[in-house]
């Protein structure tokens, strides 16, 4: 006979079920069938999440449950593990006498060798495969200014993805960019990066609010001796372009012919527009909106504020007819690219209904898209992409920056050019098309490990073509090196888990997170 005390997992299952039954009696929400959903366990891979969300919930409620679940799980998991990253040696300790070589007195030879030739720092230290993830946390996802340490979760997450997907070591550096007046000063970030660049192979800028982000990136790209990459802007642009390439193939339209509406004019969308135009789109056939309306040459507020020079550049080349409203702009538009604010219901179904046949809709606000995919489809969208992995067609930086940074590091590039970003987009699109694409699967997923070395090799070759590489190699050499580093990173992580050095997440943490999410939605 079963007794709860003798079976922990079944005890947890019984407790969750009992709580749910009580809740059902009180609120008359959970049916008998729904109780069976709660009784089942979430897999550690989380791949059965949708099966455990009650069928009686609407699509909107189900989407909210998923969002709330991942937020609750994130909080519990980060607290359980005390963050996501740690430092481990890459060299052996065969005995304590080895510290005489790894440290003093032997390490003196390393110091003088690098002093005499700074380039040897890439061979004699871990610098060549190390990226600083730098942020002042002034625009963290859709949560705004989170104070300097508030960005640590995202920055550590970026470093986590770099390592696991790209075989690149990353370190989170959240800095305080506020001056004596309390205002965020971009020069503080610029000075910090320029002073610390000699410890890294590349810099990844993250979650810096506009307009400061424009100055920080543009100055550092020119004044640093290592690549400086703004992932919110350049990374988003790269992956969006990759998705757009394949979406256009599926609807048999050409980039140079389509009408594009950009909803949101922050760093991400402004850079997307610039990169998409560089890839062949006609800027005169595009219209961009910020929170004050459409961009065009009549926007004196943008022209007069020199901090927004990137937006003013777009005012001069887009929307020649000075269309003022989204309703008018969306008439016969082929593509909508929205990166504005978290939804849903930020993008209206009525707008999508005005679009051309076989319309393409990218709604990439995080953590909730401007309109849910099902609603966009109901309004007539043919292809819908979001920034989330739990919906079809995830257009997320995670498929781009690990390979791009790896490619730049492999050839010791001095910068990442726009051509390198476009090469990455083309590589992602080509890889995705080769393995097969359709309207619900336009771009490779981060689980497809082969895309990253493929992308890295193409980026490395473009760096050589652009004359910014310090190291020459063939495409195959770059591919093999990236693939081996990625394999080693994944194998190391697996070994740490298999041998108990990284504890597996407790089943209770998963089940309770889902229970909390469902209760928050159902009341």
Segments from the language model and where they lie:
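Short, Lys/Arg-enriched N-terminal segments with co-localized hydrophobic residues
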Residues: 17-38
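N-terminal ligand-binding/catalytic initiation module
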Residues: 40-228, 462, 489-523
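Glycine-rich phosphate/diphosphate-binding loop of Rossmann-like nucleotide-binding domains
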Residues: 141, 149-166, 230, 238-340
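General beta-strand structural signal in soluble alpha/beta enzymes
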Residues: 172, 204-207, 228-231, 288, ...
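Adenosine-phosphate binding glycine-rich loop
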Residues: 231-232, 251, 360-473, 496, ...
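Rossmann-like adenosine-cofactor binding region
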Residues: 312-382, 388-390
